[in-house]
């Protein structure tokens, strides 16, 4: 039986439009197979090679000073592309993130890299609009609707928002996942552990539903990462 691999993804940026020089400063992505979180994720803070506007800082709390010693996008691009390969991306307001990711990829000037396509993306914002016409569709509003604990979300953050979105997405599609412990600010450690997926194993269809022990280890792993801040 083939496995359904989905990547719940979020980014934080310096602004709203990459055509005005804005860049990605954080990527958070979490793997889900057959609607079960596997414990594999990808998380990096990224040096945008520019200043951090105060308006953006107020949203996510990531300062230019904090990002000075973080890697450039070009140094993590290959690992990121490997992590999301052969999967459907789950994103809230997908055009925004895809626009920024494709801009970052275009700056690499590598002809072998294919741009990301919205056709391979599920937009939870669109899902929510179709399911609940006239309601509020922000991530916070959907957390409230589905009773997902977002009490620690004073600031935006790519990894913690991806964790929240994972629960919201499962609720939107008829199921639930265990609750994650959220953080209040970005961690002050240079790029906490990144556990990338074995893409070849996924291709061979070897991925199976995690055991109870694996799920517990996953929860402890995510909690450890999110508590660091």
Swiss-Prot record:
GO terms for biological process: DNA replication proofreading. It is an enzyme of class 2 (transferase). Substrate binds at residues 10, 12, 55, 60, 161. DNA polymerase III is a complex, multichain enzyme responsible for most of the replicative synthesis in bacteria. The epsilon subunit contain the editing function and is a proofreading 3'-5' exonuclease. It catalyses: DNA(n) + a 2'-deoxyribonucleoside 5'-triphosphate = DNA(n+1) + diphosphate. SUPFAM superfamilies: Ribonuclease H-like (SSF53098). It holds the Pfam family RNase_T. It comes from Rickettsia prowazekii (strain Madrid E). GO terms for molecular function: 3'-5' exonuclease activity; DNA binding; DNA-directed DNA polymerase activity; metal ion binding. Binds 2 divalent metal cations. Magnesium or manganese. Its EC number is 2.7.7.7. GO terms for cellular component: cytosol. Coiled coil: none annotated. DNA polymerase III contains a core (composed of alpha, epsilon and theta chains) that associates with a tau subunit. This core dimerizes to form the POLIII' complex. PolIII' associates with the gamma complex (composed of gamma, delta, delta', psi and chi chains) and with the beta chain to form the complete DNA polymerase III complex. This is DNA polymerase III subunit epsilon. The keyword RNA-binding does not apply. A divalent metal cation 1 binds at residues 10, 12, 161. The keyword Nucleotidyltransferase applies. Its cofactor is Mg(2+); Mn(2+). Keywords: DNA replication, DNA-directed DNA polymerase, Exonuclease, Hydrolase, Magnesium, Manganese, Metal-binding, Nuclease, Nucleotidyltransferase, Transferase. The active site is at residue 156. A divalent metal cation 2 binds at residue 10.
């Amino acid at each position: 039986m083939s496995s359904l691999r989905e990547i719940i993804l979020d980014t934080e940026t310096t602004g709203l439009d990459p055509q005005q020089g804005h860049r990605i400063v954080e990527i958070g992505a979490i793997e889900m197979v057959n609607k079960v979180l596997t414990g594999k994720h990808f998380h990096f803070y990224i040096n945008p090679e520019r200043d951090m506007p105060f308006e953006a800082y107020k949203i996510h709390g990531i300062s230019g000073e904090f990002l000075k010693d973080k890697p450039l996008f070009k140094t993590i691009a290959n690992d990121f592309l490997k992590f999301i390969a052969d999967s459907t991306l789950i994103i809230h307001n997908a055009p925004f993130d895809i626009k920024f990711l494709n801009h970052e990829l275009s700056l690499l000037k590598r002809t072998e890299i294919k741009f990301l396509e919205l056709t391979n993306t599920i937009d939870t914002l669109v899902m929510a609009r179709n399911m609940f016409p006239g309601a509020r569709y922000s991530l916070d509003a959907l957390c409230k609707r589905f009773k997902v604990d977002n009490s620690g979300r004073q600031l935006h953050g790519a990894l913690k928002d991806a964790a929240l979105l994972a629960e919201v997405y499962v609720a939107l599609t008829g199921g639930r996942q265990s609750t994650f412990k959220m953080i209040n600010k970005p961690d002050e450690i240079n790029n906490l552990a990144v556990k990338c997926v074995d893409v070849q194993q996924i291709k061979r269809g070897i991925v199976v539903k995690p055991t109870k022990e694996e799920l517990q280890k996953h929860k402890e792993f995510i909690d450890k990462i999110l508590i660091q801040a």
